[in-house]
């Protein structure tokens, strides 16, 4: 007798699921712009690859600093207020690009990106665990992969539209404040919507008591081996994924394969592979275990990075593009596996996991290596990151048996 497959989300949670999923699109857009900004600022401000890496360092430092405070805020005031506050910080960071563009000072842009990164931290800390709770635990990973697919859509739209705008040859192109002002206005409108809508608060019914507050919860988390392993794997993934995205345009243009404008379009195509991987992963994981899918994809990423490092022309480019398909399911899959069976520790765990985008600072190391004259060698860093994910995938598959 066949068991009936549980629905992706319960009917009563459908509206909250749709609303929260819009946030995934927003931060996908905001984070993908960074990958275009690197080359834009190198061209406009005459800075090196390593110097431009401070775009990622300041943005993702916001995640590292604000993840725990964001979790404490959400624990006390709830998911909805956490989302609204995050959106307001997001908008403020976007509008700070206006004085940055006026003064053409890299440091002002970095301050704006730090504030924006703090806002994104609130959104991701609230939205990722919230989506996993909007339905059956059996479909949590699939549900999060579906929401994260819209993150991929935001990334595609960002690299395509902003890339075309910033790399235009006429005098109107290149004003980086314009897309950020538009983004800030959209974010404020969405913040208004969330301030008027009541989101159901999800209260786990099982787990440890919260005696001792947030610090006590953190101490309990680090006594859970599978959570600690998931945290390490997620950090390694972020090092790999963000570094590849940030270096993509520099790599393909440095190899002489294409111009900046064409490179931003090819990056858009790569992110389309990423989105297809997310949607496909959501479908596959309703039929195949998340652990097994993660293992296959980790192997695919390691092989893809090896193809890039072999430096065999168009085959290396194909390997780089295919990697986007394989890496697509990693963040939501590792995230949901790390949160499994944590009960009332889920919010605290989410805060800790949302510190992992600080791995984006790894692009600084890639930039330093690239500035040394070898454009291929920097890919050793993402290869190492995916190797850690592969080890984690092997471990969770063995634990499942």
Feature map (PLM): residue ranges:
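Extracytoplasmic
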Residues: 15-45, 127-128, 244-249
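Extracytoplasmic gate region of multi-pass secondary transporters
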Residues: 34-35, 219-268
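Central cavity-lining transmembrane alpha-helices of secondary-active solute carriers
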Residues: 54-72, 268-280
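Helix-to-loop junctions at the C-terminal end of transmembrane segments
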Residues: 66-79, 166, 277-289, 370
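C-terminal ends and interior cores of transmembrane alpha-helices
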Residues: 88-103, 299-312
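Intracellular juxtamembrane helix-capping segments at the cytosolic ends
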Residues: 122-136, 328-343
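Helix-loop-helix hairpin linking two adjacent transmembrane segments in secondary transporters
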Residues: 138, 143-198
């Amino acid at each position: 007798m066949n068991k009936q497959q549980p629905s992706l989300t319960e009917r009563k949670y459908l509206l909250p699921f749709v609303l929260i999923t819009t946030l995934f699109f927003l931060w996908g857009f905001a984070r993908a712009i960074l990958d275009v900004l690197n080359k834009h600022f190198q061209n406009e401000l005459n800075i090196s690859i390593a110097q431009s890496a401070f775009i990622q360092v300041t943005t993702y430092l916001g995640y590292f600093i604000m993840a725990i405070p964001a979790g404490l805020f959400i624990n006390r005031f709830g998911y909805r207020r956490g989302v609204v506050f995050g959106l307001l910080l997001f908008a403020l960071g976007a509008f700070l690009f206006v004085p940055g563009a006026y003064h053409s000072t890299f440091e002002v842009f970095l301050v704006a990106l730090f504030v924006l990164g703090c806002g994104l931290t609130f959104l991701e800390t609230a939205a990722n665990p919230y989506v996993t709770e909007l339905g059956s635990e059996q479909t949590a990973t699939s549900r999060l992969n579906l929401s994260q697919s819209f993150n991929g859509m935001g990334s595609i739209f960002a690299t395509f539209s902003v890339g075309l705008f910033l790399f235009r040859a006429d005098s109107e192109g290149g004003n980086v404040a314009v897309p950020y002002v538009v983004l800030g206005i959209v974010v404020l409108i969405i913040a208004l919507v969330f301030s008027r809508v009541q989101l159901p608060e999800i209260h786990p019914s099982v787990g440890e008591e919260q005696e001792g507050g947030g610090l006590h919860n953190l101490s309990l988390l680090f006594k859970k081996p599978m959570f600690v392993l998931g945290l390490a794997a997620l950090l390694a993934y972020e090092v790999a994924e963000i570094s590849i995205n940030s270096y993509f345009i520099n790599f393909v243009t440095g190899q002489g394969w294409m111009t900046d404008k064409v490179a931003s379009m090819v990056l858009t195509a790569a992110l389309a592979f990423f989105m297809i991987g997310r949607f496909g992963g959501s479908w596959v994981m309703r039929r195949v275990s998340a652990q097994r899918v993660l293992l296959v994809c980790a192997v695919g990423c390691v092989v893809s990075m090896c193809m890039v490092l072999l430096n065999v022309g168009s085959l290396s480019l194909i390997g780089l593009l295919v990697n986007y398909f394989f890496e697509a399911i990693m963040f939501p899959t590792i995230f949901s596996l790390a949160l499994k069976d944590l009960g009332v520790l889920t919010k605290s765990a989410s805060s800790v996991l949302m510190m992992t985008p600080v791995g984006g600072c790894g692009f600084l190391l890639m930039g330093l290596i690239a500035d040394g004259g070898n454009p291929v060698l920097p890919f050793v860093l993402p290869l190492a990151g995916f190797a850690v994910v592969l080890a984690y995938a092997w471990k969770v598959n063995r634990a499942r048996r």
